Amino acid sequence: MAFQLRNNQPLEDFFNSDLSSHINLDLNLYFQEINLEKICNLSSALAQCQNLERLFLNLEFKKIDSHGMSYLSSALINLNNLSSLTLMLGHQQIDDEGITFLSSVFEKLFKLQSLTLSLQQNKITENDFKILSALQNCQNLITLNFDVSQNKINALGASKLGNALTYLKNLKTLKLNVSNNNICEKGANDLGASLEKCVNLQNLKLCLNKNLCDDSCMFGMNDSQKSFANLKSLSLDFSQNQISSRGIQNLGLLLSCFSNLACLKLKLDENQVDDIGIQTLVTHLKNCKSISTLEISLSQNSLGVNSAFNLSLLIENQTNMSKLNLNLSNNQLGPEGAFSHISVLQKCKNLTTLELILQFNQIGEKGAINLGSALSCCSQITYLMIDLSDNEIDYIGTAVTVLKVKILKMKRMVEKYLIFVS
């Protein structure tokens, strides 16, 4: 039987239900007032759900300490039939002792196939990855979503994390969020070298934003083409680091190995990327010709007209692309830059979804008109979102009127969002 506790629904409704009959249990306690006593009662109730196969439990922002984790873990450890587990434990006070209690749970859950574990903003250090070592017992695990962002993880912690992942031989989908920690060159490279051993991965999402990554942190992968032959979807977030053109060159070399990618998402916002870096990146991405979804975010870098031109070459090369999301805000594209990477879109015959964020680029009235002319040729697009705010464009002026008229001629358009606010 399925049971779902909705928003402010009393937790007692769960306590009074037929606990042994639950197979699918959804407990979102985000809006609940939870103290240690309620954690104790919740744990007692969960321990009676012996037939449970799927559990979603959201306890974020509840100030759970090691005592609370002791109660909770003692209940979870008895749920031997679980195949899917989502534990949202972010923004707590979980320390090394709490992690030890939680680790004991995964030594017993042999049937787990899918695990989402959020430990965002706790007190986790490099000594606390025993939890992933415990996951070695979960050999049926296919999907892992692990969030340890906003903790105190350094290079040693990243290395330990990577080493633990190598034991999960059946992983096909991995989402790893280690953003806002203290991971530098060695940690990132050790983590990358370990991921290379996860040869069955089909979907990989890695968030390393807000760390100490520089140009040397583009992974220690030596045989990526062979190791990631099955990879179809790749998402990398290196925003708010210290990456320049040299780092982008290393990233390009890595990406050139993934010739079978269908989905590529890159976030490099707030780094030190310039026109040379973009040219190098585009050159290496020419080997990736199977991409249907492409998302690139390069806001607050040092990109000019040449970057826009090179990105247009990349777009032109992706003949199978159906979705494009491009964020180039806070750069120096100017009116010509805004036009150049749009003018090639008419060659992307399969493109149906287009999102362009171009705010703060000195595009001006001329750029807006040129943009409209280019878009009017993209008759196949059904969803369009364009942000041209803060570009010296009069939102009640001629340029905006022309742009709107041009877009209205896109006959297949279903949804459109145009933003001009200055």
What are these regions (language model features)?
Residues 1-63, 67-71, 83-91, 113-118, ...:
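N-terminal adaptor-interaction module of cullin-RING ubiquitin ligase components
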Residues 6-16, 18-24, 35-45, 47-54, 65-75, 77-84, 95-114, ...:
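Leucine-rich repeat
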Residues 8, 13, 22-39, 69, ...:
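Intrinsically disordered, low-complexity linker/propeptide segments enriched in Ser/Thr/Gly/Pro
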Residues 8-9, 36, 63, 81-82, ...:
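N-terminal cationic leader/targeting segments used for protein routing and processing
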Residues 27-34, 56-63, 86-93, 117-123, ...:
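Concave beta-strand-loop units of leucine-rich repeat
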Residues 43-44, 73-74, 84, 103-104, ...:
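Ser/Thr/Pro-rich low-complexity tandem-repeat tracts
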Residues 224, 230-231, 235, 241, ...:
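C-terminal capping region of solenoid repeat domains
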